[in-house]
Amino acid sequence: MAAGPAFLIAGTTSDAGKSVITAGLCRAFARAGLRVAPFKAQNMSNNSAVTSDGGEIGRAQALQALACGLEPSVEFNPILLKPGPDNRARLVIRGREQGDVGAGDYIRHRHDLRGIAAAQLESLRERFDIVVCEGAGSPAEINLRATDVANFGLAQAAQLAVYIVGDIDRGGVLAHLFGTHAIISDEDRALIRGFVINKFRGHQELLEPGLVQLEELTGVETKAVIPFIDDIWIDAEDSLQSPVGRMVGPGGRHPLGTQRLSVAAIRLPRMLGVTDVEALAVEPGVTVTWVDDVDAVWDSDLVIIPGTTATVADLAWLRHRGLDRALGERATRGMPILGIGGGYQMMATTITDEGDSPSSVAGLALFDVHIALTPHNIMVNHGDGSYEVHHGQVRHHGEQTWIEGEGARREALFGTHRHGYLQDDPARRRFLTEVATHAGKPGFLVSPDTSFHGVRLQQLDRIADVLEEHWDLDQLLDEVSRPANAANTPETR
């Protein structure tokens, strides 16, 4: 069977919009009746998802699978790096954790990893009409080019057409695009089919002279200028998209009742599972904000301690900022606190590391629970949209459990290892109703019909609508169906 076309969405920088544009293209092609699959050879993210067979992939690829109408699969993200302390990361290959690696270890094995990624992409191309690939970081990191896995290394191995996305909202986009084009090799440059300007605000006619000059300098046409899309906040891939002070979602607009709920999510330095926080923001009348100060912990109706890749280190950070005392006072006053993953572990009485250098630290002592951190990674898909990914095991539990025999509950304190639990609509409504009661907000009402899944699809449709309006997707399909080495000839421009 002939392989279907595939192409690569690369970006001049991290957070240029690659993940969102890839998701939007997947959605647009799926709506057009094409069998489309997402692909990211290598992802570096702590915001992961667990597949139905217990594998682990980047959360962005799970979202892109939803855009395609597919279940998440390890095929869509065969290599995942989960950054940890001391410049090391947990390496996940085809959904299974392989252990910790340092930068030198990873670079030495990148040739093998590139082969794994290329073979997986080829398998997808044989089964789908089109595969939309997402690059990683910047393709212009020439110091890493020899062993590149996710950008031009993959594009050369699979002969992919490449589109470079630049974020105009942060400034300097023309220099970013020109510099990326200039610094890479002639062989890689030949694969570039076009530039894409993302997050544009203002009058496009003011930008046009710059685009004309950019094409004169590079020989590459700007295929699309994508406007800034307000209120797109789905499945952040990394903490760059969750800065302190940022309000998540629509900001509690249109409450059904007479009162709102304010949620403060502590912005841990090494946090993961940001989608857990985002799930609450779909509810009318709920405002969710990332915070790192004592005042916000005092003043909010609910405080969330999210997941983290380094429970002990982030607990020390939390103490350094005085947040431990604020959380303890909240608990004494009966004000709601929710800990998820590593955040739940912090709420324990003690946390013991059973690794090579055993040690023990005091937790926040909000629960009569003792946690042991072990080398073994626990991954469980509960089949209801919730899942567990953690190294902590409960050695002692003296509390009422919270969710089907898991987690802990004491009055207004909630803790669980389950990520994604609040994406379940009835579960989220029950939880917020309890929070409102404990917070003294009887005038807050949950919506009977808000759907987290539906909101995400609506957001994906919004992105797809914008892409269809500002990028000729029929032309894009025609371009990527041609041989990659035909790029940037007069006939293809």
Curated annotation (Swiss-Prot):
Gene3D superfamilies: 3.40.50.880, P-loop containing nucleotide triphosphate hydrolases (3.40.50.300). Pathway: Cofactor biosynthesis; adenosylcobalamin biosynthesis. Keywords: Cobalamin biosynthesis, Glutamine amidotransferase. InterPro entries: Class_I_gatase-like, CobQ/CobB/MinD/ParA_Nub-bd_dom, CobQ_GATase1, CobQ_N, CobQ_synth, GATase_3, P-loop_NTPase. It comes from the Bacteria. Belongs to the CobB/CobQ family. CobQ subfamily. Catalyzes amidations at positions B, D, E, and G on adenosylcobyrinic A,C-diamide. NH(2) groups are provided by glutamine, and one molecule of ATP is hydrogenolyzed for each amidation. This is Cobyric acid synthase. It comes from Corynebacterium efficiens (strain DSM 44549 / YS-314 / AJ 12310 / JCM 11189 / NBRC 100395).
